Amino acid sequence: MENAHTKSPAECLSYFGVNEHTGLSPDQFKKNLDKFGYNELPAEEGKSIWDLIVEQFEDLLVRILLLAACISFVLAWFEEGEETITAFVEPFVILLILIANAIVGVWQERNAEDAIEALKEYEPEMGKVYRSDRKSVQRIKAREIVPGDIVEVSVGDKVPADIRIVSIKSTTLRVDQSILTGESVSVIKHTESVPDPRAVNQDKKNMLFSGTNIAAGKAIGVAIATGVSTEIGKIRDQMAATEQEKTPLQAKLDEFGEQLSKVISLICVAVWAINIGHFNDPVHGGSWIRGAVYYFKIAVALAVAAIPEGLPAVITTCLALGTRRMAKKNAIVRSLPSVETLGCTSVICSDKTGTLTTNQMCVTKMFIVKSVDGDHVDLNAFDISGSKYTPEGEVSHGGSKTNCSAYDGLVELATICALCNDSSLDYNESKKIYEKVGEATETALCCLVEKMNVFNSNVKNLSRIERANACCTVIKQLMKKNFTLEFSRDRKSMSVYCTPAKGDGGAKMFVKGAPEGVIDRCAYVRVGTTRVPLTSAIKEKIMAVIRDWGTGRDTLRCLALATRDTPLKVEEMNLEDSTKFADYETDMTFVGCVGMLDPPRKEVTGSIELCRDAGIRVIMITGDNKGTAIAICRRIGIFKEDEDVSNKAYTGREFDDLPSQDQAEAVRRACCFARVEPSHKSKIVEFLQGNDDITAMTGDGVNDAPALKKAEIGIAMGSGTAVAKSASEMVLADDNFSSIVAAVEEGRAIYNNMKQFIRYLISSNVGEVVCIFLTAALGLPEALIPVQLLWVNLVTDGLPATALGFNPPDLDIMGKPPRSPKEPLISGWLFFRYMAIGGYVGAATVGGAAWWFLYDSTGPAVTYYQLSHFMQCHNHNEDFTGVDCDIFEASPPMTMALSVLVTIEMCNALNSLSENQSLIRMPPWSNLWLMAAMTLSMSLHFMIIYVDPLPMIFKLTHLTFDQWLMVFKLSFPVILIDEVLKFFARNYIETGKEVK
């Protein structure tokens, strides 16, 4: 049924053809069940494990590696002699890497699908309905409730469907619908129709929503929507329809993979084509096919060399280390790539309640009447410190601390606050904090009484548990509460009927409620211990102060407190009929007024300042009304004190009324959205994404889940619902906005470090490609074989690359604007730099092998012509007289080449400590992890040269002292070359960037 909130109860009942007292007949139930289905949310149809595994292999780099592994595998079958075993090592290792990567990927994806499943925890098991086959109410499974069912709910129940209330069977009906609307206080419901067809859920005061909880009262209503048609069901559909966006890093790596794969394919084809003339060389036994296969193997080796196999593992490790550092700052990251996304966040959309504020109502101001002279009235106003539910804080008057017991008016005000109250404060020993028991507003009044301590009780030596309610207990011992006249919407107040615990003093009635309602029923004002008639002029003055407190910077929620000195006798009252309560609360004396608010967290203002410096816009999104929202924005620095906010703050309704183009413009400018629904949050994220903003969105309720899933970074609160947590990328353990800012800083540092190690690995791979390309182009014997390349890419390069993730962050990291997600990982200049470095790495590696052939004292001392035409070496060729042709497959030159490559890479790791800073400014010991990783890498390299049987597997042998000396001579210049390139970058190429 559409817009049931706009219809009267009778219209809703007739729409379903049902009677409030008898309910649906069995036939009607069967018909409606066939039409609407069971009242449950469908289980999420997750991807099968097989689909998820296949998805992991959709990455281009992974596919190329897979292809290389398959080809190596096929070629290994045709190997002869002792090489058979080593030939199988390479495809086996590649497959192992790919499997490990796929396992990590699948595990991550499985977690993401729990979000929609978690919604099911809000489905109640049972429901109470009236059906015509039974005389009384019957309990049935909630899934069997259909639209048209007459449902009964009472305190403690979870609402089983979306229900239009038909009649309320108690004084009031309060519902906690925070999971759905984010409202921090329970909402009072009624039965009258709400005429606005576009009302937001917060304003549908005659509706009960599936999954919310009844906080007080009892009611009967007609189910108007079940299953997926309920509000919570719509949220499920939104979540199921939200596609997970790729993070900027994933997009970058995809793009990078594509470029790399094109370059690799090109080089492989080129190397193969260059050597077509050599296919018939005698070394291949004169067989053209064997020659083609030999060069095909070299092309495959090239592919293996060009792909940084270690990259996925290093990135995962770096992100995992980042998540550990973030966890220490109370930000628990659920999806690894989002760690880096945080670094380019340009907008943070934050909930108000509990994130920017403490979600702990506190009284910050109060006043009593000081004196009355004719129509002139003087008030005594007091300020109260403290921003949490604790009994600690001071009452001050005119800036100095006050002794509350000196004011009779304050003693009476404290008495009303303590007695006209069903809540209390409790000390939770396991969490070591004070918590509310009951209503937020009433708990704030309990805290006020404790801070006032009007009877000067000795509270210093009490334990925390005793301290929680010490002062309230003293007051409750003096007066006995006989009964309570519950709050009702028509009079907007509640009262308690009390008699003195000792002696024979008369009964009193203490009242608290909305100022306009209470003051209208007051005939007097309290001045000291006497009472003075309340004239309209005095009333106007008091209301003016209350209006002032309710607007402006504070936007306090005000409560008036009053006493009826001579109430009716108990037997004269009808306590069953709540419509009469207003008549009993008349002829009252106004005592005072308290103003409370949900105060901002202390550290938020500083964090918002930090965001401003870092070029990040903070948008506050709240279900509260606009006045309160703007006031909090001013308090925490989102808006300046006197800033004009006419185009910077909107309610959900105002936003909806704008044409689409203006909505986009509004989102570009605004910093505050009030009275919003979940659908608005998703819309705001969409517009921000349209502006190329990277958005972090906070939320804690079920209602926030679709927006959390849609935003690049969904941030759930530690105290939030399971749905919100599983739909998000990050959970704030302490619900604190400042933790988001700390996480953004960490994200920026991680990206910078990631850039360094990606570049480090790439320049290493460029070196390997150049090495293979040079040997093929110059016709030299192969210097490195695939299994050696794999070892370098995975182990010797992987360790320093991982350690680069520990580089210290730049000092001004939060002084720069967020980087654009479109910024390339490797710019034109950097590409040149890494080609230059890679070119040297490749040339030096080939040089090391060639040096052994041409000049080493233990080598064969062949000529360069013989070396570059080694393919033509056979016994009958005069050019090779006296040369043993097997020497061209010896292991010392390979060992030389590999040692040069590994040592150069260690020097290159030092170059990567900083993008442009010289090693003189940023010495190696600024990252001790890197020093340790380099030591370990070199130790592992020595191991494969000197520890049997590894030299056999890797085709290596021992090196002499002179050979090691040559290795170092060839390796060290890479540091000098990069220092020159860094000097140019600092002084000529990237100077503009620094200044900005």
From Swiss-Prot:
Keywords: ATP-binding, Calcium, Calcium transport, Disulfide bond, Endoplasmic reticulum, Ion transport, Magnesium, Membrane, Metal-binding, Nucleotide-binding, Phosphoprotein, Sarcoplasmic reticulum, Translocase, Transmembrane, Transmembrane helix, Transport. GO terms for biological process: calcium ion import into sarcoplasmic reticulum; calcium ion transport; negative regulation of striated muscle contraction; positive regulation of fast-twitch skeletal muscle fiber contraction; regulation of striated muscle contraction. Residues 70-89, 274-295, 775-784, 849-894, 947-961 are lumenal. It is found in: Endoplasmic reticulum membrane; Sarcoplasmic reticulum membrane. Its cofactor is Mg(2+). GO terms for cellular component: endoplasmic reticulum; endoplasmic reticulum membrane; endoplasmic reticulum-Golgi intermediate compartment; H zone; I band; membrane; perinuclear region of cytoplasm; sarcoplasmic reticulum. Inhibited by sarcolipin (SLN) and myoregulin (MRLN). Also shown to be inhibited by phospholamban (PLN) in vitro. Enhanced by DWORF; DWORF increases activity by displacing sarcolipin (SLN), phospholamban (PLN) and myoregulin (MRLN). The active site is at D351 (4-aspartylphosphate intermediate). InterPro entries: ATPase_P-typ_cation-transptr_C, ATPase_P-typ_cation-transptr_N, ATPase_P-typ_cyto_dom_N, ATPase_P-typ_P_site, ATPase_P-typ_TM_dom_sf, ATPase_P-typ_transduc_dom_A_sf, HAD-like_sf, HAD_sf. NCBIfam families: ATPase-IIA1_Ca, ATPase_P-type. Belongs to the cation transport ATPase (P-type) (TC 3.A.3) family. Type IIA subfamily. This is Sarcoplasmic/endoplasmic reticulum calcium ATPase 1. It comes from Makaira nigricans.
